[in-house]
């Protein structure tokens, strides 16, 4: 069963609806025992990094998510949930993240003249081969964000162009993230969630 971390971030229900539509066994939960027993974990998120980390800390979920990642089972962060996977964010001051992928979250530059937040459909360009990211290769997905992750090339699977390349898919072993919302990205987003479900059933895929 896939567990969606329930910590009042806004888009948990949309992720659940998408998994329900696919017929994927899933559950919303903040219970550490249920989270640790999951075959895969999804960390969604909408809003500010600082408030999201505060909510996770209040529920004592930070060490639980870190422990789940250490099991080697697939973990997927979505939008703000992807940003939380990194070491820190500079949104409204500096805030420590989960530290599961090296890197920082910084503001999208405004000197390109493009509107911030980056909102709407944009294409993903793969930067290295990966079975999960391949689903989204040269495909448009739905973005809503004002900050983006900066990380090492080996952890960047895809970027999207918005005045400059912005990180759109990341991976470190079994820990993955999408800056876009697969649950709001139509058929291609559903295909990505289906691929994540397949990863929870095949240990080799979770290490790809």
From Swiss-Prot:
Catalyzed chemical reaction(s): 5-[(5-phospho-1-deoxy-D-ribulos-1-ylimino)methylamino]-1-(5-phospho-beta-D-ribosyl)imidazole-4-carboxamide + L-glutamine = D-erythro-1-(imidazol-4-yl)glycerol 3-phosphate + 5-amino-1-(5-phospho-beta-D-ribosyl)imidazole-4-carboxamide + L-glutamate + H(+); L-glutamine + H2O = L-glutamate + NH4(+)
Pathway assigned to this chain's UniProt record: Amino-acid biosynthesis; L-histidine biosynthesis; L-histidine from 5-phospho-alpha-D-ribose 1-diphosphate: step 5/9
Residues annotated as the enzyme's active site: 79, 181, 183
Functional summary from the UniProt entry: IGPS catalyzes the conversion of PRFAR and glutamine to IGP, AICAR and glutamate. The HisH subunit catalyzes the hydrolysis of glutamine to glutamate and ammonia as part of the synthesis of IGP and AICAR. The resulting ammonia molecule is channeled to the active site of HisF.
One Pfam family matching this protein: GATase
Record-level GO BP terms: L-histidine biosynthetic process
Compartmental location: Cytoplasm
E.C. code: 4.3.2.10, 3.5.1.2
Record-level Gene Ontology MF annotations: glutaminase activity; imidazoleglycerol-phosphate synthase activity; lyase activity
Protein name as annotated: Imidazole glycerol phosphate synthase subunit HisH
Domain of life: Bacteria
Single GO cellular component term: cytoplasm
Domain Glutamine amidotransferase type-1 positions: 1-206
Organism of this sequence: Lacticaseibacillus casei (strain BL23) (Lactobacillus casei)
Assembly notes: Heterodimer of HisH and HisF.
Annotated CDD domains: GATase1_IGP_Synthase
Entry keyword annotation includes Secreted: no
Keywords: Amino-acid biosynthesis, Cytoplasm, Glutamine amidotransferase, Histidine biosynthesis, Hydrolase, Lyase
Gene3D superfamilies per the UniProt record, alphabetical: 3.40.50.880
